[in-house]
Amino acid sequence: QLTLLPIAPLMHGATQWSILGQSLVGNRTILIPKFEPHEVWRLVESEKANSIMITGDAMGKPLVEALDDPGADYDLSSLLAVTSSAALFSAPVKDEFFRHLPNIVIVDAIGSSESGNNGMATITKGDTAMKSGPTVSVLGGPVVFDEDLKPVAPGSGTIGKIARTGNIPVGYYNDPVKSAEVFITVDGKRYSMPGDFATIEADGTITLLGRGSVSINSGGEKIFPEEVESAVRSHPAVLDAIVVGAPDERWGQRVAAIIQPRGEVAPSLDEIQEYCRDHIAGYKVPRQLHVVELIERSPSGKPDYRWANNIVAEVPEASDSGGARTASDS
């Protein structure tokens, strides 16, 4: 009998699916009332948990940082796997898990409430090279459609949207307009296509790029915040980050990064730009920087992009606004 410790709140679909799955096979589940990194590790030790489930960097980063605290000497030998879903789980944070727990397996899963589980990747130490997003093996049903609702050819590099057929919802309750947008029919078959952009690799695996509703359009180029966030968060002086689009007269939008610094001194825009150029394409590098005391996220750990857009709207140009410091280069 295996023991699962899901950390995301019960309101989150991934937690619900994990608990139901464990129950169906007779495994044991431990619930934690509130996310507190050291309490998680204490429970793993005392309950001999074999697997924990998190929501990306929002939970992963505090967990690995807790293991670096003085006196953090936990017996985690029972832990076999760390599973993440619903939010970006960046390569640097995965590497930190492997530094502390070299024998675990990391499972990166993608999906949505509208489609269920679309795929997963099983990662071991040394296999965390930074990519645009997770590259997962398809679990049957998902395809990637282009703008004309034609299947994207594997290995073509064409960006499309993930769509899934099979056991999918009828629609959104009392929202026929949104239902018609997301639940589509192609060649007589119903699909759920909530808006996740992806490419198909030559071997048939899918690389998730991000949700189209939060993508940035700069000079006609589509930029997915998740890739930029992964690069910014990996900066040693950054604890957390959210990336959104800011209005730009020339390009339509420019990349704006909102960061929560690790210490009292925040990195400058120049420092962030110089660092990011080693990890992402030049046109994706942030052109505007906001520094805040705390990055806001939903209870499930997902980035609060509405809050982030409000931060950018309040301080659109280079200025000093107390709680949020902004710099921009145009």
PLM regions and their residue ranges:
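Helix N-cap/beta->alpha junction signal
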Residues: 33, 56, 86, 165-166, ...
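AMP-binding/adenylate-forming catalytic core of the ANL superfamily
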Residues: 52, 111, 160, 165-166, ...
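Conserved AMP-binding/adenylation subdomain of ANL enzymes
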Residues: 1-3, 11-53, 66
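Active-site phosphate/pyrophosphate- and oxyanion-stabilizing loops and adjacent acidic/basic residues
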Residues: 61, 95-96, 230, 274
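Gly/Ser/Thr-rich phosphate-binding loop
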Residues: 24-25, 49-55, 64-130, 137-143, ...
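Short Gly/Pro-enriched turn/cap motifs at secondary-structure boundaries
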Residues: 130-137, 182, 188-189
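Acidic/polar alpha-helix N-cap and adjacent early helical turns
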Residues: 309-330
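Short hydrophobic/charged patches on amphipathic alpha-helices used for structural packing
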Residues: 38-41, 71, 229
